Regions:
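Function-determining surface determinants
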Residues: 1-322
Length: 322
């Protein structure tokens, strides 16, 4: 599922070229410089986080590295136009590979946190033991994902990556800043259109697959909007706040889906059904009870989606260079 979602996220990146190229303006030149500085900062943050990934790493480190890899990849995609050179493609590909390598590791960390919360909430010893059963199922799975990710991360030289980024960003600009500005605006407008289409399908079908697609569309929209905001389009602050709230609500729903799948896999084994039937019954009952909240989660998502702030024209806010 994670790999499929990543592929959808990659394919969502639009390649739009301006038909007529106007002369560069002070605002467009300023935005190009701002984006260059922003890209350097994101490279620095990404390179600083990557070495902190260890088997005993705080789950927040894994989460933060995945977030910053998306931010970095989005900035690279926006800054370098297509067709991209092999070096630029590598600059874009490395954070994507690291993020994918950490996907299941991150899922296990989230699930273990949910299981611990379930154990703290219940007063029933039987339920506590049942959730401990799920925890014992998840721990070796996490260890396997940590080992798998570790092997993949060893193949990524972040120091070399930082040097490559510095070299590419130090090259003279070969593109009119106005074209870059238009590409940034078009990418956000395209994401809005894709988001609206995904929302319509999710509302019409209520299908889990379509809700997952809407989740990805929301993620794409948020990262593109965030990038535009960071390069002086400050009128998008309200939209960013709304997107963060919407993504949090979708995240709650998504975590439940991942939990349901993990519990189902944990109990749907022959030895469990033969030797741990009382535990399986308790977990299935817990699952059935929890799924009653699923429709409430979905309706909350659609309600938040309908509360989108007014979509203002994409006009940069002039600001002095700092």
């Amino acid at each position: 599922m994670e790999a499929d979602n990543e592929q959808k996220l990659e394919s969502a990146e639009a390649d739009t070229q301006a038909v007529a190229v106007p002369a560069a303006t002070p605002v467009s030149v300023d935005i190009r410089r701002t984006l260059t500085r922003l890209l350097r900062k994101r490279v620095k943050k990404f390179v600083a986080l990557a070495p902190q990934v260890r088997a005993d790493a705080n789950p927040k480190v894994i989460h933060d590295l995945r977030v910053w890899s998306r931010r970095l990849q989005q900035a690279v995609s926006a800054f370098f136009r297509k067709p991209r050179s092999s070096k630029v493609r590598r600059l874009r590909r490395t954070p994507r590979r690291i993020r994918r390598a950490l996907g299941e590791w991150r899922n296990c960390d989230v699930l273990l946190e949910i299981v611990a919360r379930q154990q703290r909430r219940t007063r029933s010893d039987d339920k506590r033991r049942a959730w401990e059963f799920v925890r014992n199922y998840l721990l070796p799975r996490r260890a396997k994902e940590v080992a798998r990710a570790g092997k993949k991360l060893l193949r990524q030289d972040v120091a070399d990556y930082a040097a490559l980024a510095h070299k590419l960003l130090s090259q003279p600009a070969d593109e009119n800043p106005e074209v870059l500005m238009q590409r940034l605006r078009d990418s956000v407008e395209g994401a809005w259109n894709d988001w609206q289409a995904a929302l319509t399908r999710a509302q019409e079908t209520r299908a889990v697959r379509e809700l997952h697609r809407f989740r990805i569309a929301t993620k794409v929209l948020r990262y593109r909007t965030e990038l535009l905001y960071d390069v002086s389009y400050t009128q998008m602050k309200a939209e960013l706040k709304w997107l963060a709230e919407l993504q949090d609500a979708i995240g709650v729903w998504h975590d439940r889906q991942v939990l349901y799948q993990a519990v189902a896999r944990a109990v749907a084994r022959e030895d469990v059904l033969l030797n741990e039937l009382p535990t399986a019954r308790i977990l299935l009952a817990e699952l059935e009870s929890d799924r009653k909240h699923e429709s409430v989660d979905v309706e909350k998502i659609f309600r938040l989606a309908s509360e989108r702030p007014g979509h203002l024209p994409l006009v940069p806010t002039p600001s002095p260079l700092t």
